[in-house]
Amino acid sequence: MSLFDWFADRRKGQSTGKITQEPEEGDGLWSKCPECGLVVYVKDLKGNASVCAGCGHHHRIDSHERIALIADPGSFEALNEALEPTDPLTFKDRRAYADRLRESQAATGLRDGVVTGLCRVDGLAMALAVMDFRFMGGSMGSVVGEKITRLVEEATARRLPLLIVCASGGARMQEGMLSLMQMAKISGALERHREAELLYMPLLTHPTTGGVTASFAMLGDLILAEPKALIGFAGRRVIEQTLREKLPDNFQTAEYLQDHGFVDTIVPRTQLRSSLASLLRLHGCRPMEITSA
């Protein structure tokens, strides 16, 4: 077999006669924890909410897995699924934005980087938005902003509590100001939700950064976070260069932010649904049938 044929077979996914290493995440039978190196069956890892049984490391999960962990089985009703991003600036860096969108849509099965809808948690009705980091790093463009805004408005109209699961690199630069204005738009909708005396809880997962942190991620009545999640605005290196000093090793972690009053509580993923149910009951939320508006 020539070298050219070997690479051609590799591209087709055919065997080359060599033993190749299984991916560490998801596609093979086994998964290796990047923190402690523990190797476990993927099935066992998924059965533990994708949390390492050895060290508690929270592996990244997609929006569908997240919804399954939060919502009562069969209770999630998606909203505004038809909204699809455009390319208003005909933006191109190393690649065209339109190509990046098509690639992300094909890889994730999503139209954009957030899934929104209504659900029940232990029988209690709640509005839920889940950002998906697989879609262009969870970046917030006009569709992400519009879907979250519509969900907040729906929650306000129905007098429902709201949970937004944040996982984002920030505003989507390929949409320019159309992306940045989503920060103010969502914040305005959340203020009306607050004025209606309704509960809003953001859940900060790894990573939550940039314009998402600078807007709706930090506007909650109760700010929740997953253990060791990276949470910040600018990158660590940028801050160190600006301040000209070394930052603590745990800087921009969920634990650091909790110690400094920016996060109210850290909730392990395996305890999330029960913790949410307790918080909803504590704030007087009630069972409710979810019907189409």
From Swiss-Prot:
Coiled coil: none annotated. Zn(2+) binds at C33, C36, C52, C55. This is Acetyl-coenzyme A carboxylase carboxyl transferase subunit beta. A zinc finger (C4-type) spans 33-55. SUPFAM superfamilies: ClpP/crotonase. It comes from the Bacteria. Its EC number is 2.1.3.15. NCBIfam families: accD.
